[in-house]
Amino acid sequence: MRQHKLWLCALLVLLLAALGAFGAAAETTVGMSGAGSFKMEQVYVNVPELDVYFYALDGDGNSYSPIKVQAAGPELTLGDRRLEVRSVAAASDPICYILALDNSKSIEPSEFYTMLGGVRKLINAMGDDDQLMLYTTAGSTECVLPATSDKNLMYKTLGSIKQVEGSMDTARLISAVYSELQSDYQALAPRKAAMIVTDAGQVLTNMALFATLASDVSDQIGMAAYIYLMTDRPGVFETLESAADGRLVLCEALTLGDELKKKQEYLATALEIKTEVPESLYGERL
């Protein structure tokens, strides 16, 4: 298989043609109808292979089966080119969890170590082939664990993280993650999910971080991205949470692990379309 990268943007559109099951056809990455919704999670390209991961939910929030989606006649277009939809299946590829932990000293030590315990719950529940890439963010952005599926190494690295002075620089974090993804694209698991974990106290003193809560980080790094905000006053952030459409998760430190596992269960409901990219589009930025 030729190892090329194809740059994609919102020109990649998933259309559902048999509308009896899904209501009105939807364009761009998110579609809603009275009968249900679909949301594109990520596109993975390893030319000529192109995989599209997405969610198709009914009106009650339950996932449609691959058979129903296939029967609906999905169409995939890249710009003005229609791509062949070979099959629709439950997504089974491993996931690379890209986790950024706020290790600032201004977080209460008890909260910080509870946060680390929550991450351990996520590691416990990860599949054997899933990967973890771990960043710390206080003072400077550092990748303390390159992507690995070695759980012993995950636990060891997590246990070595200490609190330091400084605050999170979200612009630097996003830049570092994007750069790392591009340099190790083929070595990482096909599916990727970014998660930022921080404390409400940090947000109230860091306007750049506050702005990040109101933005869609996934648009900047090309994958699903979620921010976990530990707080015992969720009402302060309810407006932001509503606007974030599931990207912002409010929780107490004690329930962080449960929330991370919930997200993992949600990721397990994704569907996948496999297709191929025409050779004429190899290497193009669209």
Tell where the protein language model's regions lie, with residue ranges.
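VWA/integrin I-like adhesion module and closely mimicked acidic/polar interface patches used
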Residues: 198-266
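Bacterial N-terminal signal peptides that target proteins for export
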Residues: 1-10
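Acidic, polar low-complexity linker/tail segments
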Residues: 26, 34-98, 105-112
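Bacterial N-terminal signal peptides
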Residues: 10-20
